[in-house]
């Protein structure tokens, strides 16, 4: 089924200048970039986006990391896009990620793990709406 999902290339990957390599992974695996923007998240935006994690012990560090530099936010479209994106990203902890996944190849740690991807179709809809207006597609 053709779906859309959200992907965020995080500050650590921008600092390493691997944005193009990550986008190539998506495109060469059947995911089309249908919307994209580069921005610097405010603390408020990061807190609102990651509100589901507000009570978790890592929340403060996550917010500090996500506002530490610019990010690239994208909408990816393709067959089973949510699952495909998660497969391409690999495990949250790059040490556990399979060789050839984005996190295994480009991430430093469980915190600086290069990319974010929606974990469900419902969350994909909400996350896309957080960053993009319908007219941007």
Curated annotation (Swiss-Prot):
The cellular location(s) given in this protein's UniProt record come to:
Cytoplasm
Q: What are the GO cellular component annotations?
A: cytoplasm
Q: What does this protein do?
A: Major role in the synthesis of nucleoside triphosphates other than ATP. The ATP gamma phosphate is transferred to the NDP beta phosphate via a ping-pong mechanism, using a phosphorylated active-site intermediate.
Required co-factors: Mg(2+)
Family from the record = Belongs to the NDK family.
Disulfide connectivity for this sequence is none
Please report the name of this protein according to its UniProt entry: Nucleoside diphosphate kinase
Q: Report the GO molecular function annotations.
A: ATP binding; metal ion binding; nucleoside diphosphate kinase activity
């Amino acid at each position: 089924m053709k779906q859309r999902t959200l992907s965020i290339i995080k500050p650590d990957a921008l600092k390493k200048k691997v944005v193009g390599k990550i986008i190539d992974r998506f495109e060469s695996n059947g995911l089309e970039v249908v919307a994209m923007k580069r921005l610097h998240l405010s603390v408020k935006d990061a807190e609102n986006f990651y509100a589901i994690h507000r009570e978790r012990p890592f929340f403060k560090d996550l917010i500090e990391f996500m506002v530490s530099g610019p990010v690239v936010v994208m909408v990816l479209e393709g067959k089973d896009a949510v699952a495909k994106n998660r497969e391409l990203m690999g495990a949250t902890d790059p040490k556990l990620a399979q060789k050839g996944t984005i996190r295994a190849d480009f991430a430093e740690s469980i915190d600086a793990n290069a990319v974010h991807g929606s974990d469900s179709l419902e969350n994909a809809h909400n996350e896309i709406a957080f960053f993009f207006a319908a007219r941007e597609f």
